[in-house]
Amino acid sequence: MFAPLQNDTFLRACLRQATDYTPVWLMRQAGRYLPEYRATRARAGSFMGLATNTDYATEVTLQPLERYPLDAAILFSDILTVPDAMGLGLSFALGEGPRFATPVRDEAAVARLEVPDMGKLRYVFDAVTSIRKALNGRVPLIGFSGSPWTLACYMVEGAGSDDYRLVKTMLYQRPDLMHKMLAVNADAVAAYLNAQIEAGAQAVMIFDSWGGVLADAAFQTFSLAYTARVLGQLKREHDGVKIPRLVFTKGGGQWLQAMAALDCEVLGLDWTVNLAQARARVGENGPHAKALQGNLDPNVLFASPAQIETEVAAVLDSFGRPHLDSSQPGPTHIFNLGHGISQHTPPESVEVLVNAVHTHSRSMRAVRT
């Protein structure tokens, strides 16, 4: 059904297998910083018009790959498609971000929540299949979802938030309601990601964008536990091929040790984390060893080309030399930003970044020890 994969560097790095260079892709790589994306978005008329149209979603997913030699594509969609399918009424006002018409703020609203019919998300799965075919084996396709906790933040707040007052009020006043919501969210996310895998996704990523706003014990109880519930239900392989699972928690560096116990292959790190220390704690060998992904500050891309190259080298050097033994797994690194790329990023800066990653990481492997 799909063309053979020509560049499997990203997938091999996810599975802690030796690679010739460090693979690179960027969170939000298909996005507003690209003029061609803005043109397609204008034709679509709205963000949801873009995300729910298979042809448009395919077009914008491939746009960054036409410009840059990236090592993976990521589905163009939004993390809030799942609560939208639950009937919360998602909309995007220009310049304001996502908003739900019917937020979940009381016992009755929580009681009405249920895992949505995946048929309501058919447009996402059709896009996955269309993108996979259009890639024609060039690079792997990553599917994704928001984490149960991050979805709950939007579902309760009704939009983005500066202080998370409403969702944290529910968490502390009615933890029973929060647990009910998170359980439904976790089972919905698992079903959603499994359907993406069935449709052609070759890896899946859970974005816990707001895990870092939680207090220490609350993170383990209300975020990590439900991310683990999702991972426990995900397909490990499809058509005999392993499907790597990636988890990214923005602000989660302090919980790296706890996150290492997650049943996944890759941990994504934001720019506040020291890669060398992360490798020493969870990236070497052992029962919970993980591939690491990250973690350049996205604002580096506003610097000069020479400074971008310097900062890229610093991230690669911080992780250190990946292992070179193709006969066994070992420490591996996937280069990414520490969060999504800014819409204001000059497109030429991304070209500098990608070329710097490939060039410097090859030279690191060429050094004899």
Swiss-Prot record:
GO biological process: protoporphyrinogen IX biosynthetic process from glutamate
EC number: 4.1.1.37
One Pfam family cited in the UniProt record for this chain: URO-D
Enzymatic reactions: uroporphyrinogen III + 4 H(+) = coproporphyrinogen III + 4 CO2
Pathway: Porphyrin-containing compound metabolism; protoporphyrin-IX biosynthesis; coproporphyrinogen-III from 5-aminolevulinate: step 4/4
GO MF annotation list: uroporphyrinogen decarboxylase activity
Keyword vocabulary terms for this entry: Cytoplasm, Decarboxylase, Lyase, Porphyrin biosynthesis
Positions annotated to bind substrate: R28, Q29, A30, G31, R32, D78, Y154, S209, H339
Residues the record marks as site: Transition state stabilizer: D78
Enzyme class: lyase
Protein purpose: Catalyzes the decarboxylation of four acetate groups of uroporphyrinogen-III to yield coproporphyrinogen-III.
PANTHER family for the chain: METHYLTETRAHYDROFOLATE:HOMOCYSTEINE METHYLTRANSFERASE RELATED (PTHR21091), UROPORPHYRINOGEN DECARBOXYLASE (PTHR21091:SF169)
Name listed for the protein in its UniProt record: Uroporphyrinogen decarboxylase
Organism lineage string: Bacteria, Pseudomonadati, Pseudomonadota, Betaproteobacteria, Burkholderiales
Gene that this polypeptide is encoded by: hemE
